[in-house]
């Protein structure tokens, strides 16, 4: 949904996203064979990163920021059914939530406005993408107990996008060495918030501690 990649903006599917992530880590490892490789995923990217780690991505550690792990039994059957029906009947319908859903993603209002004007940012997900996100979150939840890489989880207490309980559950399920950083003034876009420098510093310190 973001960036300058060629081709149409279509949902590639969970398997493609996970495979692409694994391929990128292999490429980075090839180019920098003497450096550790850490995979960072934010929101949906956190779910993809967690699933990719379990699928054999060649990494030394994992960083999950506000990860999308609201899957498995956390998603009620009626919600799943509605998402499936929407993806089947109106797959390309985009949902803005305007007038119905009021969610603030960050306390950095100028950055939110800039993102809203950026043509490379697609903020309104389609029905197909909603269903795809659910599948990714299911994969991430199932993967967590099998992931043994050192993992740093980041979460903001003011996050209005990712609920805290699934993040806490995924953290507890992780099988390897793990660290949780919680930010009382943090929102969903932790790396764009007004205190983003604090978050980036914590990431850098954690990586240094792994060496």
For each predicted feature, which ranges?
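Short alpha-helix in the alpha/beta-hydrolase fold that links the catalytic acid
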Residues: 149, 163-172
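Short beta-strand/loop motif that positions the catalytic acidic residue
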Residues: 147, 153-155, 159
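Catalytic nucleophile-loop/oxyanion-hole region of alpha/beta-hydrolase
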Residues: 3-33
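Alpha/beta-hydrolase active-site loop signature
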Residues: 1-3, 69, 187
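Catalytic active-site module of serine/aspartate enzymes centered on a nucleophile-bearing elbow/loop
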Residues: 177-211
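Active-site nucleophile elbow and catalytic-triad environment of alpha/beta-hydrolase enzymes
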Residues: 125-143
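Alpha/beta-hydrolase fold nucleophile elbow
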Residues: 32-43
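Alpha/beta-hydrolase-fold enzymes
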Residues: 42-126
């Amino acid at each position: 949904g973001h960036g300058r990649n060629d081709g149409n903006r279509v949902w590639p599917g969970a398997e493609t996203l996970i495979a692409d992530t694994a391929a990128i880590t292999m490429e980075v490892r090839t180019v920098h064979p003497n450096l550790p490789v850490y995979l960072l995923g934010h929101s949906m990217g956190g779910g993809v990163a967690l699933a990719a780690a379990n699928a054999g991505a060649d990494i030394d550690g994992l960083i999950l920021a506000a990860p999308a792990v609201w899957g498995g039994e956390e998603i009620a059957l009626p919600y799943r059914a509605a998402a499936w029906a929407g993806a089947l009947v109106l797959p390309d319908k985009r949902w803005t939530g305007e007038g119905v859903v009021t969610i603030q993603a960050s306390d950095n209002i100028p950055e939110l406005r800039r993102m809203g004007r950026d043509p490379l940012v697609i903020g309104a997900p389609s029905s197909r993408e909603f269903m795809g996100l659910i599948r990714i979150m299911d994969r991430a939840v199932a993967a967590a107990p099998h992931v043994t890489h050192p993992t740093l989880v980041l979460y903001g207490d003011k996050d209005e996008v990712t609920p805290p309980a699934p993040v806490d559950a995924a953290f507890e399920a992780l099988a390897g060495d793990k660290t949780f950083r919680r930010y009382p003034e943090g929102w969903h876009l932790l790396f764009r918030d007004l205190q983003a420098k604090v978050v980036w510093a914590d990431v850098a310190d954690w990586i240094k501690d792994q060496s």
